[in-house]
Regions:
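Cytochrome P450
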Residues: 1-449
Length: 449
């Protein structure tokens, strides 16, 4: 008798019913109840066969210990996506909906060995220079601006109007984007992840980041872009563009969903309100149970190997389910007895998130400021009417409608910048008529009113 003979029934709506096929991690059924899918996948053992999109096969690690083994074994499991056998054999094309997040790019996420160490150290050292006071000031300024745009209405979509925009604005400030370049960075990243004309959005983003690199070569400032440029790793312009695109894109999407998922938890679980709105605790619980990047960390075996009893061939695509690993039955007792931050939401090993402390700080500050400004904010629709965006990687709500007592809209007193990193010291970048006067420009104008 093999594992399939005793397998439980797949979740309702799962196309794997009776077919023996790989379990699909896309579509509304998976988005509506991913934990039911993870429970089913655990029957296979520590790893299971899944499909990320039609025709895109992968092995998904669902066990905490096996996930740690993979993430920490950089000798046996590599990150360079040029090893991806199915892609090299033409079974997965560059037009696949999952290709943008899996295909190789010359950045530290897809690098191994000495290249990874050099690129990663440059990123880590540059991000470590971000002062928490500056981060708090920037988050508060941007939070105040965003709330001023919808506060008078008495209702808002806390995702589209707030959580989705705030990380991009904060990153624009930290990376020293002047008005025109910042507008196009916002346009590019939003389009890439929202799937609206993603090809154009990607082109706009990389062109804007390329101009930012040229700008900072000519006139560096006190910002992450300039620090990365001056690092002893001596990154080339091409390397600079790809590291910045990674930090901006891969940082903004999970962070906006972390803010959104934590807000969702605070607004739908009464115990946080009873206990004084413990934002830090709600954040940790979200990272354990509803992490914004639920299934990711693509790896490729360097040679035919075995992982927790599963046979893998060289070049197979292997992902880690942070959501499944964090919520495994064996972890329940140890989670209560041990650290509340031993989850895998930030990944682990040499490719763990280099920006987890800034991400925590931005999330807590953004939610604290929102609750201070809108103390009676509450969910505007029944919780069971909320929908989650389909897709194999992210755990993200489509919308988060809220209502509150309207607050007076107007110019708020904001702290002075003190760094000049938003572009006041920069030469003007070439304008793009389609994005002229965009969101970043409007925020900078609001700051100086």
């Amino acid at each position: 008798m093999n594992a399939h003979d005793t397998a439980p029934v797949p979740p309702p709506g799962c196309p794997a019913h009776g077919s023996g096929a790989r379990v699909p991690l896309y579509g509304p059924e998976f988005a509506a109840d991913p934990q039911a899918y993870y429970e089913y996948l655990r029957h296979y053992g520590a790893a299971a066969p899944v499909e990320l999109a039609p025709g895109v096969e992968a092995t998904l690690v669902t066990d905490y210990a096996a996930a740690l083994q993979l993430l920490q074994d950089s000798g046996s499991f590599r990150k360079d996506a040029r090893r991806w056998r199915a892609f090299n054999e033409g079974k997965v094309g560059p037009d696949s909906p999952v290709a943008p997040l899996l295909a190789y790019r010359p950045n530290c996420m897809f690098a191994d060995g000495a290249d990874h160490i050099r690129l990663r150290q440059a990123v880590t050292d540059s991000m470590a220079r971000v002062d928490t006071r500056r981060l708090s000031r920037s988050t508060e300024q941007i939070s105040g601006y965003l709330i001023s745009q919808f506060g008078g209405r008495g209702s808002a979509d806390l995702l589209g109007d707030y959580a989705k925009q705030l990380p991009l604005f904060v990153f624009n400030e930290l990376f020293g984007c002047p008005a025109d370049i910042g507008d196009r960075v916002l346009f590019g990243i939003s389009g890439m992840f929202d799937g609206v004309n993603a090809e154009k959005a990607t082109s706009v983003l990389f062109q804007a980041v390329g101009e930012l690199v040229a700008l900072k070569r000519a006139k560096p400032g006190e910002d992450v872009t300039s620090w990365l440029m001056r690092h002893e790793a001596r990154l080339s312009d091409e390397e600079m563009v790809h590291q910045l695109a990674l930090l901006l894109g891969a940082g903004a999407e999970p962070l906006r969903n972390l803010i959104g998922n934590t807000l969702h938890r605070l607004l739908t679980h009464e115990r946080y309100a009873r206990e004084g709105g413990l934002i830090d605790e709600a954040l940790d619980d979200t990272l354990w149970e509803n992490p914004p990047m639920s299934n990711y960390a693509p790896h490729y075996p360097a040679a035919d190997t075995e992982l927790a009893g599963q046979q893998l061939q060289a070049g197979d695509l292997v992902l880690v389910s942070f959501a499944a690993a964090n919520t495994g039955p064996a972890l329940k007792a140890s989670r209560q007895a041990g650290s509340n931050r031993a989850h895998l939401a930030w990944s682990a090993g040499p490719h763990a998130c280099p920006s987890k402390e800034p991400a925590r700080h931005i999330t807590v500050s953004a939610i604290e400021h929102l609750f201070n400004e809108l103390p009676d904010v509450e969910l505007a629709v029944p919780e069971d009417s909320l929908t989650w965006r389909p897709g194999p990687f992210n755990r993200a709500l489509a919308t988060l409608p809220a209502r509150f007592t309207p607050v007076r809209s107007g110019q708020r007193t904001v702290p002075q910048q003190g760094t000049g990193s938003t572009g006041q010291d920069s030469r003007p970048a070439p304008e793009r008529p389609a994005e002229r006067g965009g969101m970043w420009s409007q925020f900078l104008n609001w700051l100086t009113r």
